[in-house]
UniProtKB/Swiss-Prot annotation:
Domain ABC transporter stretches: 5-235
Stated name of the protein: Sulfate/thiosulfate import ATP-binding protein CysA
PANTHER family membership: SPERMIDINE/PUTRESCINE IMPORT ATP-BINDING PROTEIN POTA, SPERMIDINE_PUTRESCINE IMPORT ATP-BINDING PROTEIN POTA
Complex and partners: The complex is composed of two ATP-binding proteins (CysA), two transmembrane proteins (CysT and CysW) and a solute-binding protein (CysP).
SUPFAM superfamilies given in the database record: MOP-like, P-loop containing nucleoside triphosphate hydrolases
Recorded family membership: Belongs to the ABC transporter superfamily. Sulfate/tungstate importer (TC 3.A.1.6) family.
Primary location group: membrane
InterPro entries, per the entry: AAA+_ATPase, ABC_SmlMolc_Importer, ABC_transporter-like_ATP-bd, ABC_transporter-like_CS, Mo/tungstate-bd_C_term_dom, P-loop_NTPase, Sulph_transpt1, TOBE-like
Pfam family, one: TOBE_3
Keyword tags: Acetylation, ATP-binding, Cell membrane, Membrane, Nucleotide-binding, Sulfate transport, Translocase, Transport
Subcellular compartments: Cell membrane
UniProt keyword ATP-binding present: yes
Length: 351
């Protein structure tokens, strides 16, 4: 495997705050890698360090085999798209996309052909004569991506490009971004705090916390086999049954304690059958969230079941039920990998 980006032992401090703590990070050529983490985790600092917008205090940055640690951003061969799109308001969509090519004094015929192709690729062929204020937020971000791609960057860096858009538009654009990447195959690094976006779009996910990379792997790897409790908790809701972290949708709810469960795979474990009391039943479209209290410990936890299962069980507040985990992911760091404050922050509940 070849790597388009190699970050070696990068450290970055802002006074007493450690933004990057001896980070080692690689991006395979042609991949789309997501940097995922909470605010202050170091994900944007890492991206800006790769871009040359920030300089690491220690360590090196290599792009396609070239040490660019002290090379200015404009000479790194990168395309950069920010959360808040930067557009020339007095230029049309076509001229915005063509701007970088004109600065590089490319032939007019080449510029026209390149811009026409990119506008088609990003779905803006019919908008070339419009101005930025005549576009929707999603269309402006597509224009920004086209402009970044116009100069044939070696790598494309995206800093929460859809963060300022509403949920429905973000969902549409992340599916579009995945299709775009599959078409152009440029090495891409995407910063996001949206777990669903990272799982949906990326080939690989790097989870950051307090300036360190906690885990790097495919979406399936980091979700199904988290390196520690923080990774598991940050990638989705978590409950604790008999000391084991489990996903709410991996908790089976029944009326009787006879709940034999077949292991989902070789890594699945068991928490045994527990008795609980229903506190609240919340219908969420095709799913139902069941808020429960352990009869043994009084601890609160949550199960996520299908609408059909909920209707079959006819759950009501105050009902006594039995629960069992259908799958317990292996966690290298164990439950103790998250301190009490961390558990509260990432909404881990316990029984």
């Amino acid at each position: 495997m070849t790597y388009a980006i190699v970050v070696a032992d990068a450290t970055k401090r802002y006074g007493d705050f450690v933004a990057l703590d001896h980070v080692d990070f690689v991006v395979p050529t042609g991949s789309l890698t997501a940097l995922l983490g909470p605010s202050g985790s170091g994900k944007s600092t890492l991206l800006r360090t790769i871009a040359g917008l920030d300089q690491p205090d220690t360590g090196t940055i290599t792009i396609n085999g070239r040490d660019v640690t002290r090379v200015p951003p404009q000479r790194r061969g990168i395309g950069f798209v920010f959360q808040h799109y930067a557009a020339f308001k007095h230029l049309t969509v076509r001229d915005n996309v063509a701007f970088g090519l004109k600065i590089r004094k490319r032939p007019k015929a080449e510029i026209k052909a390149k811009v026409d192709n990119l506008l088609q690729v990003v779905g803006l062929s019919g908008f070339q004569s419009r101005y930025p204020n005549q576009l929707s937020g999603g269309q402006r971000q597509r224009m920004a991506l086209a402009r970044a791609l116009a100069v044939d960057p070696e790598v494309l860096l995206l800093d929460e490009p859809f963060g300022a858009l509403d949920a429905k538009v973000r969902e549409e654009l992340r599916a579009w971004l995945r299709r775009l990447h599959d078409e152009v195959h440029v090495t891409t690094v995407l910063v996001t705090h949206d777990q669903a976006e990272a799982l949906d779009v990326a080939d690989r996910i790097a989870v950051l916390h307090k300036g360190r990379i906690e885990q790097v792997g495919s979406p399936t790897d980091v979700y199904d086999a988290p390196a520690n409790a923080f990774v598991m908790s940050f990638l989705g809701a978590v409950s604790t049954l008999n000391g084991s972290l489990v996903r709410p949708h991996d908790i089976r709810v029944g009326r009787t304690p006879n709940m034999a469960v077949a292991a989902a795979d070789g890594t699945a474990g068991s928490t045994g059958v527990l008795r609980a009391v229903v506190d609240r039943v919340v219908v969420l479209g095709f799913e139902v969230r069941v808020e429960l209290t352990s009869a043994a410990t009084g601890g609160a936890f949550t199960a996520q079941i299908t609408r059909g299962d909920a209707e079959a069980l006819a759950l009501r507040e105050g009902d006594t039920v039995y629960v069992r985990a259908t799958r317990v992911p292996p966690i290298a760091g164990g439950v103790s990998g998250v301190d009490d404050a961390g558990v509260e922050r990432v909404k881990v509940t316990s029984t």
